[in-house]
UniProtKB/Swiss-Prot annotation:
It comes from the Bacteria. GO terms for molecular function: 3'-5'-RNA exonuclease activity; tRNA binding; tRNA nucleotidyltransferase activity. Homohexameric ring arranged as a trimer of dimers. It catalyses: tRNA(n+1) + phosphate = tRNA(n) + a ribonucleoside 5'-diphosphate. Its EC number is 2.7.7.56. Phosphate binds at residues 89, 127-129. Belongs to the RNase PH family. NCBIfam families: RNasePH (TIGR01966). GO terms for biological process: rRNA catabolic process; rRNA processing; tRNA processing. Phosphorolytic 3'-5' exoribonuclease that plays an important role in tRNA 3'-end maturation. Removes nucleotide residues following the 3'-CCA terminus of tRNAs; can also add nucleotides to the ends of RNA molecules by using nucleoside diphosphates as substrates, but this may not be physiologically important. Probably plays a role in initiation of 16S rRNA degradation (leading to ribosome degradation) during starvation. The keyword Secreted does not apply. Keywords: Nucleotidyltransferase, RNA-binding, rRNA processing, Transferase, tRNA processing, tRNA-binding. The gene is rph. This is Ribonuclease PH.
Length: 241
């Protein structure tokens, strides 16, 4: 039986990825990132203050918030603000985004400033957290480039690029960049965050159906590295445009 994906993509093929800069007017950095039908608005906001634990230390901070619009999925979900608290999934994802982006920033060069990345899912079709990280990096880069242009900082605080992609085992085959039909029916699901130097920042992998073997893990990481190379090229092209 010939293996096929619901989308018709090959096992090592990303969905069509678009990175649109300056999508909104007011934020220092603003990006609409699309991975196929998944669309996330990422904005970077700069404030001249830091959390209490960093006051007087001369260091900056990078953090993130994440949320999904009520009808970003097949059925409407209540806004978390209406429920009075954020869910565990939301907190997990926004902490992941913050950790990923702090890994590419020299916080001493940033000075006592906070950059907040707000990642709002407009439409979800799998891979929202990886799309958010990939787009938020470009929004962050735009924000720090503006700080340099205005003379607010002298040294560029970015020490490399960061992107993320999902991989998984779907119907027994390792695949790259899972969409919703694959994500909801896969044997293994993994999110990979890397820098453009080839270093791994975070791996989140879970066996959904059956335990995965070491050779399958190696195959998944190889797929992630291939996809990451394409994503870094897209980020560079977007920032050069």
């Amino acid at each position: 039986m010939t293996f096929s994906r619901p989308s018709g993509r090959t096992a090592d093929q990303l969905r069509p990825v678009r990175i649109e800069r300056s999508f909104t007017r007011h934020a220092e950095g603003s990006v609409l990132v699309s991975f196929g039908d998944t669309r996330v608005l990422c904005t970077a906001s700069v404030e001249n203050r830091v959390p209490g634990f960093l006051r007087g230390k001369g260091e900056g901070w990078v953090t993130a918030e994440y949320g999904m619009l009520p009808r970003s999925t097949h059925t409407r979900s209540d806004r978390e603000a209406a429920r009075g608290k954020q869910g565990g999934r939301t907190l997990e994802i926004q902490r992941l985004i913050g950790r990923a982006l702090r890994a590419c920033v020299d916080r001493n060069a940033l000075g006592e400033r906070t950059i907040t990345l707000d990642c709002d899912v407009l439409q979800a079709d799998g891979g929202t957290r990886t799309a958010a990280i990939t787009g938020a990096y470009v929004a962050l880069a735009d924000a720090v480039n503006l700080l340099i242009k205005r003379g607010d900082i002298k040294k560029h605080p970015l020490i490399g690029a960061v992107a993320a992609v999902s991989v998984g085992i779907y119907r027994g085959e390792p695949v790259l960049d899972l969409d919703y039909p694959e994500d909801s029916d896969c044997d293994t699901d993994m999110n990979v965050v890397m820098n453009d130097g080839g270093g791994f920042i975070e791996l989140q992998g879970t066996a959904e159906g059956h335990a995965f073997r070491r050779d399958e893990l190696n195959a998944l990481l190889a797929l992630a590295e291939k996809g990451m190379g394409e994503l870094f090229a897209l980020q560079r092209a977007a920032l050069a445009g």
